[in-house]
């Protein structure tokens, strides 16, 4: 018989297995921070948009990090923080050191007499400026920092694309002017060629080597060429973005099917031509997107009046011609705009370029940011203050300060149909105080659906009656809204809500959003308007597909997962049962053995005493 102790142990084991299974269903990550929810929802809505149309805020590491903190390993902590808070584009100056014939991050060459302690920062004077540089800060160390971030976010919930923009520059050999001999030039060059073995082992001699540590997560020109030649792109969901030969994989293919995370692009090449300059190798062309490698990056400058005026014209475009938006979506790729100390972004210009489909790159040392405590705007050079100011403005989708509890968007329903019968009748209460109380009571459960207003997406009461944004199939920049048809969100997805060939839709990119807002302005339609998005099933998990769409991140236990959960515990249980069985078979109990010998002896004595032969008479 199995002892009570063993039964108890097995019971606890079974309960633990069941507890693990149940916990896996309910324990999905708590993604309550506003920015994280906005980042994930915008990414999910745009996952079938080609990667060249994905936009996001960027930062110049040289201007805002290294020039202020020094070119040291400690500065990489800021890089990690930038990635963590949602900055997905990093602009970096790569310097070709003509003295050492290697790429480095420090803008100045290290002297030949540098100490063997490569982790000590040095004050280096070069080209009229003094830099604080640490030899151990290499491109490899930067890549390792980014790889750490990639590993930490390698889940379906957090995965995203990181774009590195390289500006190539030269640390040129410029010997003293005048009549100098070749030996004097050689001596001059040697003064900036450290011979210490620790230093010589640092940095890389080719662009390919600088990015090779990304491994298979790097999306390369070779990958793009293979994608365009294969039939793979035919399987991408949004055919509109695959109409040209210069098509790119969509974000879903990039991240979740091909498992790519990083793309490196040279956006400017200021290498000085000389006998010591860098020559691009065939390996470079296969790993880094250079000019002519199939990516025509659009780089605009904020100081360029034409770029500003073109963006303003696009925002206020009121002509019935969707080709303007289609041409941008199909013919312009990776659109970025960079500012400088002469013309830095304001909140308005930053937001405008985001709306125009650009990725704004912060490249100025100081910005006019809003101080919440003082309630005023002030010039600030703090990286954290600058990023905190611009991150909420970096979404082409969500309006600023959305997703903040408890209000969750519009405070008062725009509907006057208070009895929710989809008709305006005598049963509806026009008293604003009564309506306010009714809206307040339902706000905690009904504010789960998304509308579009003049500032972007906002969470609203699902029972409010609004016009419906209808998007044409196969033509995502073509919209239709019938102002006479106002419905609750729960009925907006029905077939009769939109004309033939149109469906209840949502903008999946900044240009689609701009096309919709242009249509609304042109048709003089009042905001807000329903778009197909809600978090009804799981809080903070915004999905498209109507009110019954399920959250893709809600944990479920399939048979395979359940088998995986139970298998380890089942093996342990089998081992325990085997041990119990072995104990029953092979273990000898002294008390039980003595008892058997006693009775056997007594029986033998009885038999000897009363032993009979034959049948007693």
Swiss-Prot record:
Keywords: Glycoprotein, Membrane, Signal, Transmembrane, Transmembrane helix
Principal subcellular localization: membrane
Ranges annotated as spanning the membrane: 562-582
One Pfam family named in its UniProt record: TIM-barrel_MTC6
Protein name: Maintenance of telomere capping protein 6
InterPro entries membership: Telomere_Capping_Maintenance
Glycosylation sites: 113, 179, 204, 208, 242, 279, 327, 341, 347, 363, 411, 524
Key word Transmembrane helix present: yes
Gene designation per UniProt: MTC6
Source species of the chain: Debaryomyces hansenii (strain ATCC 36239 / CBS 767 / BCRC 21394 / JCM 1990 / NBRC 0083 / IGC 2968) (Yeast)
Residues annotated as signal peptide: 1-22
């Amino acid at each position: 018989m199995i002892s009570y102790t063993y039964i108890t142990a097995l019971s606890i084991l079974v309960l633990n297995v069941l507890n693990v299974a149940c916990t896996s269903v309910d324990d999905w990550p708590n993604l309550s921070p506003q920015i994280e929810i906005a980042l994930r929802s915008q990414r999910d809505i745009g996952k079938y948009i080609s990667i060249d149309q994905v936009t996001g805020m960027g930062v110049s590491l040289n201007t805002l990090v290294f020039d202020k903190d020094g070119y040291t390993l400690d500065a990489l902590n800021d890089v990690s923080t930038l990635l963590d808070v949602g900055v997905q584009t990093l602009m970096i100056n790569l310097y070709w050191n003509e003295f050492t014939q290697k790429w480095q991050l420090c803008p100045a060459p290290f002297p030949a007499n540098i100490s063997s302690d490569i982790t000590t920062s040095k004050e280096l004077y070069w080209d009229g400026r003094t830099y604080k540089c640490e030899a151990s800060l290499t491109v490899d160390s930067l890549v390792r920092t980014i790889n750490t971030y990639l590993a930490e976010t390698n889940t379906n919930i957090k995965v995203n694309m990181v774009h590195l923009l390289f500006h190539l520059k030269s640390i040129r050999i410029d010997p003293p002017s005048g009549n100098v001999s070749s030996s004097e030039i050689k001596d001059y060059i040697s003064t900036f060629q450290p011979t210490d073995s620790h230093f010589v082992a640092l940095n890389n001699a080719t662009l390919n080597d600088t990015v090779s540590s990304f491994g298979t997560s790097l999306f390369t020109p070779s990958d793009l060429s293979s994608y365009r030649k294969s039939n793979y792109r035919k399987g991408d969901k949004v055919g509109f973005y695959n109409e040209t030969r210069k098509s790119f994989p969509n974000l879903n293919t990039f991240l979740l099917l091909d498992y790519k995370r990083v793309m490196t692009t040279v956006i400017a090449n200021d290498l000085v031509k000389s006998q010591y300059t860098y020559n691009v190798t065939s390996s470079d062309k296969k790993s880094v997107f250079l000019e002519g490698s199939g990516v025509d990056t659009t780089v605009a400058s904020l100081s360029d009046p034409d770029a500003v005026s073109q963006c303003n014209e696009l925002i206020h475009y009121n002509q019935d011609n969707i080709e303007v938006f289609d041409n941008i979506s199909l013919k312009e790729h990776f659109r970025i705009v960079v500012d400088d100390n002469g013309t830095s972004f304001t909140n308005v210009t930053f937001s405008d370029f985001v709306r125009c489909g650009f990725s704004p790159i912060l490249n100025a040392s100081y910005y006019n940011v809003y101080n919440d405590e003082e309630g005023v705007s002030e010039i600030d050079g703090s990286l954290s203050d600058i990023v905190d100011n611009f991150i909420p403005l970096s979404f082409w989708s969500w309006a600023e300060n959305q997703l903040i509890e408890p209000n969750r968007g519009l405070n008062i329903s725009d509907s006057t149909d208070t009895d929710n019968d989809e008709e305006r009748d005598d049963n509806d209460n026009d008293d604003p105080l009564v309506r306010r109380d009714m809206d307040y009571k339902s706000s905690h459960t009904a504010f789960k659906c998304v509308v579009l207003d003049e500032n972007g997406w906002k969470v609203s009461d699902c029972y409010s009656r609004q016009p419906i944004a209808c998007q044409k199939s196969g033509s995502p920049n073509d919209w239709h809204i019938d102002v006479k048809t106002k419905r609750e969100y729960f009925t907006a997805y029905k077939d009769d809500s939109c004309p033939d060939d149109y469906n209840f839709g949502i903008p999946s990119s900044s240009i689609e959003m701009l096309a919709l807002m242009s249509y609304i302005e042109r048709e003089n339609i009042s905001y807000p308007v329903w778009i197909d998005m809600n978090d009804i099933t799981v809080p903070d998990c915004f999905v498209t597909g109507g009110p019954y769409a399920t959250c893709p991140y809600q944990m479920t236990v399939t048979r395979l997962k359940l088998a995986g959960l139970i298998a380890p515990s089942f093996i342990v249980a089998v081992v325990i049962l085997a041990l119990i069985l072995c104990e029953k078979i092979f273990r000898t109990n002294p008390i039980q053995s003595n008892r058997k010998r006693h009775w056997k002896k007594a029986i033998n004595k009885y038999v000897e005493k009363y032993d009979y032969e034959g049948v007693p008479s």
